[in-house]
Swiss-Prot record:
Its main location: cytoplasm. The proteasome degrades poly-ubiquitinated proteins in the cytoplasm and in the nucleus. It is essential for the regulated turnover of proteins and for the removal of misfolded proteins. The proteasome is a multicatalytic proteinase complex that is characterized by its ability to cleave peptides with Arg, Phe, Tyr, Leu, and Glu adjacent to the leaving group at neutral or slightly basic pH. It has an ATP-dependent proteolytic activity. PROSITE patterns: PROTEASOME_ALPHA_2. Keywords: Cytoplasm, Nucleus, Proteasome. It comes from Encephalitozoon cuniculi (strain GB-M1). Belongs to the peptidase T1A family. SUPFAM superfamilies: N-terminal nucleophile aminohydrolases (Ntn hydrolases) (SSF56235). This is Probable proteasome subunit alpha type-7. It is found in: Cytoplasm; Nucleus.
Length: 242
């Protein structure tokens, strides 16, 4: 008997094939990185140059949700747009009810709820998106990774999108816990270029958001002139260079 893979039905092996297909869609998305140390959180997003007429600022990858929450998504553009709006809606209602931004624990619940809804109905398509969420609460930072199944876990560094395999290997070599914001930004830009293959990948720009003690946990986007020196430093790095 062939497996039923057109909806969220279990196969004979106990799997849901649509989850695997959705994850493949997310894995083909633009590369995004999150890193967390005791000093704060850094989010980086790759932004391929789709046209010479492309306006960089028109495509916002990293979104500020509330005062102390930042989100970056990758995967199918329609799904990443929905996820960003859904997270914003959950955070808005939480703040309306409790007069504060959600804790990391509550954000896990909200992220689970958003993604799980699409894995339980036979008439729904699983979301082809992964997210990285930064949360600041009571003097500490959290970085949450959510996959297509809705599984949400805390990480000190995580990567989503097509460069995940190479970048994860590089991140595992680092002592991220003690790194400063500046060091995490520097390393993040470096590994983005290490995972880039000029022979088959488009040129890209980089969007960076930081949340630190200095910003009060508030997510701040770096300006182009702050990113440009790092791009010049690493844009010619070899894909095979260690």
């Amino acid at each position: 008997m062939s497996n039923l893979d057109f909806c969220t039905i279990y196969t004979t092996t106990g799997q849901i094939d649509q989850l695997s297909y959705a994850q493949k869609a997310a894995d083909s998305g633009d590369t995004c990185i999150g890193m967390k140390s005791k000093h704060g959180v850094v989010l980086l997003a790759e932004k391929p140059r789709v046209s010479p007429l492309y306006i960089l600022e028109s495509d916002e990858k990293i979104r500020k949700i509330g005062n102390t929450i930042g989100v970056v998504c990758t995967g199918m553009s329609s799904d990443t747009f929905y996820v960003g709006c859904a997270i914003k809606d959950y955070v808005f209602h939480h703040k309306e009810n409790f007069n504060e931004d959600p804790t990391p624990g509550m954000m896990k619940v909200y992220l689970n709820d958003i993604f799980h809804y699409f894995t339980r109905g036979i008439n729904l398509r699983v979301l082809g998106a992964n997210t990285l969420t930064s949360v600041y609460k009571d003097g500490s930072f959290s970085l949450l990774h959510t996959d297509c199944s809705g599984k949400t876990l805390s990480y000190k560094a995580a990567c989503i999108g097509k460069g995940t395999r190479r970048i994860k290997t590089e991140l595992e070599k680092l002592d991220i816990d003690t790194m400063t914001i500046e060091e995490m930004v520097d390393v993040g830009v470096k590994v983005l270029y290490m995972a880039h293959d000029p022979s088959k990948d488009k040129e890209f720009d980089i969007e960076i958001g930081i949340a630190s003690m200095e910003t009060g946990g508030d997510l701040r986007k770096l300006e182009n002139h702050e990113i440009r020196p790092l791009v010049g430093k690493y844009k010619h790095i070899s894909v095979d260079e260690d």
